Amino acid sequence: MLSIKLIDKYYPEENELKHILLTHSRSVADKALWIADNHPELSLDRDFLYEAAMLHDIGIFLTKAEGIYCFGDKPYICHGYLGADLVRSEGYSRHALVCERHTGAGLSLEDIVKQDLP
């Protein structure tokens, strides 16, 4: 499976961070598949949904969020585009779009400027 291979590449050790990532990503993937199964009229690509859901947070290890064992140097909000860069470099540009676009929903321009978000 593409997603597990990439996760294992960037998270080679079995540790709390990998456990958190996998648990969360599986929950997101399960919800995405539930939506696909309950809305056949959308004709969604289940394989893509699963893989993209599993990979959407792959960039978290590059961020600073010590509460979830992330000891990188970038703000957590950056994990989307950081993960997209990783996934894109592996040749999966469609999956990268999901990584980079899943963060920031509901933020106004004023919030972004006020909080000095990237």
Residue ranges of model-derived segments:
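Short alpha-helical patches at coil-to-helix transitions and adjacent helical residues
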Residues: 25-29, 80
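Short glycine/serine- and small hydrophobic-enriched flexible loop segments
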Residues: 30-37, 85-89
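Divalent metal-dependent catalytic cores for phosphoryl transfer on phosphate-bearing substrates
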Residues: 41-118
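Alpha-helix N-cap/helix-initiation sites
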Residues: 18-25, 42-48
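A general alpha-helix detector
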Residues: 6-9, 31, 82-83
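Active-site flanking loop/helix segments enriched in acidic
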Residues: 2-24, 61-72
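A positional/architectural concept
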Residues: 10, 27, 34, 39-40, ...
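General structural signal for secondary-structure boundaries
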Residues: 1-3, 13-14, 42, 108-110
